[in-house]
């Protein structure tokens, strides 16, 4: 039984260590100081207060219409 726990401990340790550093460094490299700033303009989106479609029925109750 002790051999099983030792083997599982070794396998778990090796398995957890294999993931270390596989995707490169674990930090972000410093930004390039000569890189130009982004040139894409920021577009502001405004939301209308009037709905595009009226989803009410002919009376005051809501409709079950799927557009």
Curated annotation (Swiss-Prot):
A lipid is attached at residue 20 (N-palmitoyl cysteine). It is found in: Cell outer membrane. It is a lipid-anchor. Disruption phenotype: Inactivation of the gene impairs LptD oxidative maturation and causes the accumulation of intermediate oxidation forms. It prolongs the residence of LptD and LptE at the BAM complex. Residues 26-67 are annotated as: Disordered. One of its GO terms (cellular component) is cell outer membrane. Its main location: membrane. The keyword Repeat does not apply. Interacts with the outer membrane embedded portion of the LPS translocon formed by LptD and LptE (LptDE). LptM binds to sites in both LptD and LptE, forming a 1:1:1 heterotrimeric complex. Component of the lipopolysaccharide (LPS) transport (Lpt) pathway that promotes efficient assembly of the outer membrane LPS translocon (LptDE) by the BAM complex. Facilitates oxidative maturation of LptD by stabilizing a conformation of the LPS translocon in which LptD can efficiently acquire native disulfide bonds, thereby activating the LPS translocon. Might stabilize an active conformation of the LPS translocon by mimicking its natural substrate. This is LPS-assembly lipoprotein LptM.
């Amino acid at each position: 039984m002790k051999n099983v726990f030792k083997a599982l401990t070794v396998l778990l340790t090796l398995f957890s260590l294999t993931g270390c550093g596989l995707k490169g460094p674990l930090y972000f490299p410093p930004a390039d100081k000569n890189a130009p700033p982004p040139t894409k303009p920021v577009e502001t989106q405004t939301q209308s207060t009037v709905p595009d479609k009226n989803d009410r029925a002919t009376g005051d109750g809501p409709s079950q219409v799927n557009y």
